[in-house]
Amino acid sequence: MKYLLPSAAAGLLLLAAQPTMAANTGGYATTDGGDVSGAVKKTARSLQEIVDIIEAAKKDSSGKAVKGGAYPLVITYNGNEDALIKAAEANICGQWSKDPRGVEIKEFTKGITILGTNGSSANFGIWMVNSSNVVVRNMRFGYMPGGAKDGDAIRIDNSPNVWIDHNEIFAKNFECAGTPDNDTTFESAVDIKKGATNVTVSYNYIHGVKKVGLSGSSNTDTGRDLTYHHNIYSDVNSRLPLQRGGKVHAYNNLYDGIKSSGFNVRQKGIALIESNWFENALNPVTARNDDSNFGTWELRNNNITSPSDFAKYKITWGKPSTPHINADDWKSTGKFPAVPYSYSPVSAQCVKDKLASYAGVGKNLAVLTAANCK
C-alpha cells in the first residue's frame, strides 16, 4: 500500500523559521546538529551549493583549514529536482549504472543541519564520513542513481551522533535484468556502518526500497546503538534493519508490505521491537544468513501478540535451507537493557491510525503524542 501522507499545513513553509530547541530525538542521538550558538545559516538551491557551503565552513576567515570545521552550519535546501526524479522514474533500469550523486560531509564535527523546505526534492544522497553531530530533516530523496557504486540516499560511516528525521526516501522495488547477484536496482535508504553509533532515525516515510538499511557492514563491524521510531515502511524488501550486533530500539513504526524479511538480528545483537504495527509482512522478525551467531529480540506491545494474529494481519513465514530463527512463535528471546533516554510510545493502534499525518516531509516536523490518539 502506498500511504497518502497529508500535509500538516497548507502552503510551502520555510522550515528554517523553526525555533532552536534542545535536542530530544527520542533515541540514542543527542545532537542539535548545527542549530547551536554561533551557527552560520545558509540557503542552498542545488547539490553543488550545499557542497560549496560545507567546504567553506572547513576554513577560517584567513582561508586556513580548521580541523572538524570552523563553525556550525544550518543549511536550508530549497532546490527542486522533480524533473530528474521524473526522468529516473521513466528509465528505472538505467539508474543502476549511472554515477552516484551526493553531498559528502567528511571530517566535519562542528555540527551541521541540512533542512529541506516544503516542496523541495533531491535526486542526490547525503553521505557522512568521519563526521559527527549531523541532522538531516524534511528532505525528499527519490530514485538515487549509481546503485552499482553504492549510491545510497543516506550513508553514515564512522559518524556518531546523527539524527535522520522527517524525510521521504523512495525508489522502485523490483529487479532489472543485468544487475549482479540478484541485487537491487537501487542502493539503500539509510546505511549505518563502519563504527557509526548513537543514531536516531525517526518520522521518515520510506517506500519502494528493496534493501532499506544496514546496521554494520560486516561481521566485524558491530556494537552500535540505534533507535528507529515513528517511521513508515511500505513496499520494501528487507533490511529493516539488517542488524550486525549492537542494540536496536524500534518503536512506533508502521511496517506494511515487507516482501522478504524485516528485522534480521545477527551477530548476537539484540533488538527491542516495541509498539509497532505490522501487516502484509513476510518474516517480519528473524535471524538468518549468519551461521550460529543469531541475535535476540524483545517483543513488547506490538499489534501482533501471538501466532493467532498472523492470519488477521497477513503475516507469513519462510524457512530457508540455511540456519535461521524466525519469531514465528512470537515470543521474546532476550531482554533489552534500559535505554539512556526518555520516550513515550503511543499504542500500536494509534500508529496505524495516525502516523501517516506525521511521518515524512511537509509536516512541519510535527510529532505524534498520546493526545493525538484520541
UniProtKB/Swiss-Prot annotation:
InterPro entries named in the record: Pec_lyase, Pectin_lyas_fold, Pectin_lyase_fold/virulence, PEL
Keywords: Calcium, Disulfide bond, Lyase, Metal-binding, Secreted, Signal
Principal subcellular localisation of the protein: secreted
Active-site residues from the entry: 239
A cellular component annotation (GO) from this entry: extracellular region
Protein localization: Secreted
Reaction(s) the record says it catalyses: Eliminative cleavage of (1->4)-alpha-D-galacturonan to give oligosaccharides with 4-deoxy-alpha-D-galact-4-enuronosyl groups at their non-reducing ends
This protein's pathway: Glycan metabolism; pectin degradation; 2-dehydro-3-deoxy-D-gluconate from pectin: step 2/5
Paired cysteines (S-S): 93-176, 350-373
Cofactor note text: Binds 1 Ca(2+) ion per subunit.
GO molecular function: metal ion binding; pectate lyase activity
Gene Ontology annotations of biological process type: pectin catabolic process
Enzyme Commission code(s) on record: 4.2.2.2
Sequence positions that bind Ca(2+): 150, 152, 187, 191
Cofactors demanded by this protein: Ca(2+)
SMART domains the UniProt entry points to: Amb_all
Signal peptide as annotated in the record: 1-22
Function comment: Involved in maceration and soft-rotting of plant tissue.
Similarity section: Belongs to the polysaccharide lyase 1 family. PLADES subfamily.
The protein, known as: Pectate lyase 1
Organism of this sequence: Pectobacterium carotovorum
